[in-house]
Amino acid sequence: MPRSSATARKSHSNRHENGSANTGKKVAKQKSNGHLNGNLNGGSASSSLSSSQVDLPSSRSSSDPVVPTTTAASTKLNGTPDSSKGDCNAPDHLNGYAKGNADMSYVQNDGVASQTGGDVAGPASRRTEKSATGSKRSPSNASVNPLQLASTILKSCPMYDTIAILIFLLQLPPMVLTLVQFLFASLTFLPPSGASAGSLTSNFDIFQGPAGTPSLGTMIAMDGFCLLIWGLFMWTWAQNFALDLAHVQVAITLGGGGFGKNGGVNTLCVGIVLIMHLVRSKGIQDFVIGHLLSSNIISPDMLSQYSHLLPTEFRRTEPQTSPSWLRSLLAVHILAQAGTAMARRSMAKNRTPNPPRTGKRIDTEASAGSQTQIDSAFESGASVSSYIGADGQIVTSAAHKDGRDRLLSAKKRRRQANQVRSRQPFWAALASTKITVMREYEHSRALSKTARSLPMTEDDLQGLSLDDGLVWITEIDSSTIKFAAGDFSSADDSSGSGACEAGCLGSEDMEPFYVCVNGALWATATICKVHDAPKGSSMVHWRGEISGLAPNCAYTCSFVRSDTDEEICVISVKTPANNDAEQVSSVSTPPHPSYRPSSPTTTLKNSIVNAEAKLNEKRSRLRKAKNDHKLIISKIRKELDNYNHRLHSGTDENRQKQRSLQLERNIRQTEEATALLEDQLDNLENVPEEELRKWSDQKAKYEHELGLLNSAKEELASARSAIAREVSSLETELSSAIQRRERLQSRRTRINEQYERIVSANAQGLNERERRAAEQFAREQDQAKLEATFNEQFATIGQSVQEYQLRAQQIWQQCDAIEQAIQQQHQQMLLDPGPLTPEGNLPGTNPFSESALPLGALTSTAPSSRSLLGLSFPPLKSSPLQTASSPVGASSSHPTSPVQQPSYLNFPTSPLVNASSHLDSDFVYRHRSFSNRSARSSLYGSDFMDSSRRQPFQLDLSELLADKRSPGSDSNTALNSGLRPVSSPFQRAGSRGSGSGSNGSGGSGSGSGSPSSVYGKTN
């Protein structure tokens, strides 16, 4: 939108003539006219249009396949007048506007685009229509009406827009509202810059997320979290309220109420929806009405009277229903993304420091990227502040501090552009879309001919009916711009007054126009008339060249008529960078190229600096060429001196004469020597007779001696052959003898080995038998010792048994005496007529009467039983000694006592007696290996009983005392009636028979072949 003049002047002071001004430096005000940034009318330049004009050539340079590279001009005619030029003496102009680039060109003439292509970019000038009053200002250049200008400005009202959109959304049918929510939700998955093949395959755009929007993973995670809360904690009323909150988010986004300082819009919209849901809630209505009725504030009649005034939507008769799953999913997604965006904005606002406040008024274009800067700094993690310069590029403060303007990467520019685009309201987005579509349409129309056919040349313009005063660019170089022009002659232009100085024209050929570069009269511009072309046959009448330009800089070239000082056209051209390596190294180009022309003073200064740089470069090249020439000349001189020296040294006459005389002398000496040798050869051909005779005698002697030598050689050969035969026979005999000797030695060795083996085997066999005999003897000795030990134990046990039996007999005798005394005492007490107790007979007792008890009952009736005064007792148990294991069995003839044996009579037995006897079953029973297959020893009979089944010994004590045998006797085993004589438990394998005998030590053994028996007999 066009700015006012005051705003333009204030914003113009913050601009630098070569681009964006440094943020930390004071910017000097420009003292030139308003021909900056490619706009001739600096007060009415449109920001959107200028930005589109800057970005369009750069964006289309890589996409158009066929673009002429030698022209760059576009012209817009019939503009508004501007201030006067300081150096060109041009009071007004046509406000012609042209933009040029080395990569593309297009022309705008009265709003209609046309393309000439090729080297001729298109019509860039037009004949000025003179008014009838002779005024220099065109009637079409009148100022714009203020009312008309104000009517074109759309005021930003985000609150009104948001509320209007919210009301509109709430009135839509459910089906249409669902469709709107679906379209809005689908926009969150699309990149802000549009889908492309590169963005679909980029990890940053898919997973990391573009600037201003979360990544795909974050979206899915937030949607899942909100969906979980929706299903678990949200009841029906809350779900319907959240569904309307999604409408609020859509309205805020489309109306632009969520950006800037319009935070109250969110609260207002949410409050409206909340109040509406609270009023519509049946529970709240019942609560309020019941409270009002109970407090008698409103009567039921009044309520029924005014209830029909309420809308039908507020009078609910049934509770709300849950929304459908599709609308629930869309609402969850919209609210989740809204919450994510709010969190990201709050984090970015808290993280980025607030900029310092200054008293200067900030340009609206420069401040448009302030919020973008905050979010971009938050997204990229960089603390470098940035802003959008006037040339449409992002400039960082760190670059200005270093004194250089550095461009940010394309990724950051894309992020910031996406953020600015996302913060635009719905109406601004529609306007931006319309501008973009129209610009693309105009550009496609302008380049239609170039894209379809080959580039056009000047020859293609023959026969075309074009207006007079046509100027076009033919070639753009790093330091020069070449142009051509048509015929400017007319009936009114017969006079040649007011012309500028001509560089190459005569007095009869005046220049119809002159050139101003960036508002300054350009003295190095040359214009020449084409003389060889016939009039009317060619469009080219004038050719010119603008030299002295700097590479990679933007210029505004103005073509002004010489007679009326009116601007024919204005062309904005940017010179390409220099491709010469030497010139690039010598001339330093600015690090940040400017995309708008400089002021006249700056242009002249840059031209002077460029000319001085070229002059210095040429001087340096000249000095370098001089040095190279000096080196080459010195080398040539050295070679010339060498050749002269060789020439002088090779043409000396004296040396040549001496050399020729020397050669002649050598020839004569050689000839003399040859003649002498020939004479000697002639003399040697004639031999004397005496010498011939001597030679024949010597030859005969030699032959005789030779025959003797041959015969001696034959004899020697025969003798050698005979001796060789003898030696061979002897060698054969010797070899046979050696072979026999070796065979005998091998046989002797084999026999010796056999002998040694036999001897060792014999010795080993004897030793083995002796060892076995010694082992057998040792085992028999051990067995004999073991038998003697057992015999001694048996004798000791027998003696102890006899002693115990004698002691037991004595004790039984004492017991019998005690029993007899007790019986006598009882009989005496029974025979006594007195009472049994001092108190008399006890009550309930029946004293015995002598008449009732017969005397025969007081005596014992059976020998095996005992009776005491008519009382019969069972037979007594056997003595404990009778149950113990003893090899001697005996039975006592005395009756046993009915009383228990006293404890002092239990004498401890011998340790040998306490041990299990060798005749006991516990001693015999033991687990055997595979060699002993019986659980009991096979040496004992099957009728051998253990102690639990053994019969008591029936042994008379008198016989035991009468017949005492020795402890080592073998006949004591026969006393046991329950046992039978068995063989010794240690029967040897070598014994053939069995028998009994006694030795001096009391041991017994059997087997006549046993060494132990022999040892026992000898001992």
From Swiss-Prot:
According to its record, what are the GO cellular component terms?
membrane
Q: Which UniProt keywords apply?
A: Coiled coil, Membrane, Transmembrane, Transmembrane helix, Ubl conjugation pathway
State where composition is biased (Gly residues): 992-1008
Source organism per entry reads: Aspergillus fumigatus (strain CBS 144.89 / FGSC A1163 / CEA10) (Neosartorya fumigata)
Q: Which top-level group of life is the source organism from? A: Eukaryota
Subcellular location per the Swiss-Prot or TrEMBL entry: Membrane
Name the protein family: Belongs to the acrB family.
Q: Which residues form a coiled coil?
A: 602-788
Please report the name of this protein according to its UniProt entry: Probable ubiquitination network signaling protein acrB
Q: Which PROSITE patterns does the UniProt entry name for this protein?
A: PTS_HPR_SER (PS00589)
Start-end of Polar residues biased regions: 68-83, 131-143, 580-589
Where does this protein have compositionally biased stretches of type Low complexity? 33-63
Principal localization reads: membrane
Q: Which membrane topology describes this protein?
A: Multi-pass membrane protein
Annotated region (Disordered), positions in chain: 1-94, 109-143, 343-371, 580-603, 831-855, 879-905, 963-1019
According to the record, the segments passing through the membrane are 163-183, 216-236, 259-279
Q: What is the recorded function of this protein according to its Swiss-Prot or TrEMBL entry?
A: Component of the regulatory network controlling carbon source utilization through ubiquitination and deubiquitination involving creA, creB, creC, creD and acrB. Involved in resistance to acriflavine, and required for normal growth on a range of sole carbon sources, including fructose, cellobiose, raffinose, and starch, and reduced utilization of amino acids, including GABA and beta-alanine, as sole carbon and nitrogen sources.
